[in-house]
Amino acid sequence: MVWVTVVVQWAHVALAILWVGIAVTVGVVLAPVSAALPLPQQRAFGLRLGKRVGPLFGIAGGGTMLLGILRGTVFGPLHSLAAFTSLYGLTFIVALLLTVAVAILGGGPLGAGAERLYADDALWQVGPDSSLPPALVAAQQRLHVLARWELGGF
């Protein structure tokens, strides 16, 4: 049974590394590079990126949470409600709440906001003076702030 605990523990760690790694790569590397591209290329890149990383975020985030819960309860010391009042139990609860908050932020306003941004044709129409549409700039800034909050949550 010890080997199952080891597998659950390290799969949990590996998925968490993948989750954070994707978020850092997208937020710190790919988003700034994309922002330097012309608008049509930005949009095409964003659409392709979303199709690729969206499922990975779901698998990595969901797997991290599921295996973390299993590691703390089934394969860990939290076998009764009283155990949740221990230092480990309280740490487990705080970690779970923070993880759920990051997952909700990433899957909700950030993920859905990015999907809406790249799907909305009207946002990507450049004005006659070649200026960026204010709604596009506002949406990109909002996503940038949300991405920073997500990274801060990790």
Language-model segments: which ranges?
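Polytopic transmembrane helical bundles with strong interfacial aromatic enrichment
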Residues: M1-F154
